[in-house]
Amino acid sequence: EQLIKDILSGIIVAIIALPLSIALAIASGVGPVQGLYTAIVAGFFISFFGGSRVQIGGPTAAFVVIIYGIVTTYGTDGLIVATIMAGIILCIMGLCHFGSLIKYIPYTITTGFTCGIAVTLFVGQIKDFLGLDMGAVPSEFIEKLGAYAANITTTNPVTVAIGAVALVILILWPKVTDKLPGSLIAIIVTTAIVYFAKLPVNTIGSVYGELSSEFPSFHMPAFSYKLVQELISPAFTIAILAGIESLLSAVVSDGMIGDTHKSNAELIGQGLGNIFSGLFGGIPATGAIARTAANVRNGGRTPIAGITHCITLSIILVVLMPLASLIPMTTLAAVLLVVAWNMADWTSFFHLCKTAPKSDMIVLVATFFLTVFFDLVVAIEVGVVLAALLFMKRMAETADVTAWKYADEPDVTPGEAEKMRDIPHSIRVFEISGPLFFAAADEILAITSDKSTKVIVIRMRSVPAIDAS
């Protein structure tokens, strides 16, 4: 009985993953087929070797920004190298039992770059949604907006109308039923309208040509020391993103099925998935929260569901891929507009801006703007360093050195004197509280004595940690 549920759930999740995989691949600057390759190859290894029984892997919106930047700078081969490197890093993290360390990435950083990715993804769909007649879209955010403004007069009203129809379906369909994804219905309806009415709207086929229906083939990219050196930072960022999103997805699914995932095994599964995704022409992948949740809601409880999802996508690749060339580009843009809207947790973002400590707000806003105006690699690097520095400053401010008073001092009341220990004036007692580390080392300077002092007692029972400083 459970086997049948897993198989049916895998088929449903494959239907959900199909339009998303194609749309995310196009938004990342690669061919639509590469999105399916990723969902098939990486999805299989993530389900088979991962530490969660119900995890569904594949391309996600979190990678769009960094993939687009890598493809623009280093081409497809550079992306493959970065994907394989990220997979190796993930495997090393899993083997070194770093699964629990992902929780040390501050919430302000994940919220900041997630909202930044959402804005970048949203803006990146404007060309296809409006049907603008323009060349390649610049990778930089400001230049992108300038290019849109310069070509806004080339907007295609028919394209906008089809995109609007897709948006309406995507927004209203979940209120009708959640058995079939709104993205699939939007694609079927708008594709039929454009095809039978012969409307002048760009489709996947008109932009990318005929799509391949062949299985992915093994391809070993050309590695060089210089390329590896240049891509180590983007690869590390991909690995961190994959680790965060996959473990978050695993935690969410644990709550839904009453299970506990193995975080280190999950990282190894993610690593193998990315290594083989790169070797078979795919892009970076991770556990997808929405697809994993859909798997659980439809009865999936074992890795069979994830493997069935991969097999179903393989069949679709071989049998139905030529039909995918008929899908309007504006429909895929509409799908990603909704994805961008849903992934951005603006409620948490503005709540943190209002209520979080000033240091946390600085990290949040800095990570957000760096993601939008520079790139995700810079945003995460600066965000982590900034969060660490501000946290150390906060901890240093909690460290304090207090000198004990003598019972016969003028400002000591009789009631206080009764509770105090009677110690001779030749002994000075200092009490240190808070962590004593390099940023708080100056507090030691508060320990002073006069000529009458023969003994200094330093009480450190309130010091939770101390370093070599």
Predicted regions and their residues:
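Transmembrane helical cores of multi-pass ion-transport proteins
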Residues: 1-408
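Structured cytosolic domains appended to multi-pass membrane proteins
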Residues: 403-406, 411-469
